[in-house]
Every structure is written in structure tokens, then in C-alpha cells.
Amino acid sequence: MTDLRHYDVIVSPAITEKSTLVSENNQVVFNVAKQATKPEIKAAVEALFGVKVTAVNTLLRKGKTKRFRGFVGKQKDVKKAVVTLAEGQTIDVSTGL
């Protein structure tokens, strides 16, 4: 798989309060493409960051219905991946991809 395809799999790091809490357990959270599979996510993280991945857990957050000035809209669905790294491995997501 080429580097360009790896960048299509990993959309962005998810920087939230919960993701900073799980970072203490050698885990990193990424927003990923909806059609990405766990093996693709594992291969992309290992290739782009040069780390060993032990597990990948995914979740699909459904978009919320929101109102703006009386008009009803919907946020997009987001797929997230919680990537568990091997012992002693780290990724600094604050510097960007």
C-alpha cells in the first residue's frame, strides 16, 4: 500500500478529553475513513508513524440532528479508531501528520 493510500485511511487525530485520558494506556485515537478496515488502519499507522500496533478498536459515531435558526440539519457520521501501541511505543499527535 502506498503512502498516499495510508493518508486516505487516517483522516486526522482525535484530540478530545477522552483521547488524552486513554493516551496514558498507550492508546491513540484517530478519525478514519468510513470504509477503512482494522487491518488497513493498523498498516497505515505502522507505516506512517513507524510504531508497532497491538490492537485496533473501531466505533461509528452517528451524526447528531442540530437546529440553526429554525432549520434542521444533521452532522456527518464519524468513524474513530482507538489504536493500542506496543509497550514503549509513543506517537506525538500534537505535531500533525
Curated annotation (Swiss-Prot):
Disulfide bonds: none annotated. GO terms for molecular function: rRNA binding; structural constituent of ribosome. One of its GO terms (cellular component) is ribonucleoprotein complex. It comes from the Bacteria. Pfam families: Ribosomal_L23 (PF00276). GO terms for biological process: translation. InterPro entries: Nucleotide-bd_a/b_plait_sf (IPR012677), Ribosomal_uL23-like (IPR013025), Ribosomal_uL23/eL15/eS24_sf (IPR012678). Signal peptide: none annotated. Gene3D superfamilies: 3.30.70.330. Keywords: Ribonucleoprotein, Ribosomal protein, RNA-binding, rRNA-binding. HAMAP family: Ribosomal_uL23_B (MF_01369_B). One of the early assembly proteins it binds 23S rRNA. One of the proteins that surrounds the polypeptide exit tunnel on the outside of the ribosome. Forms the main docking site for trigger factor binding to the ribosome. Part of the 50S ribosomal subunit. Contacts protein L29, and trigger factor when it is bound to the ribosome. Belongs to the universal ribosomal protein uL23 family. This is Large ribosomal subunit protein uL23. It comes from Rhizobium leguminosarum bv. trifolii (strain WSM2304).
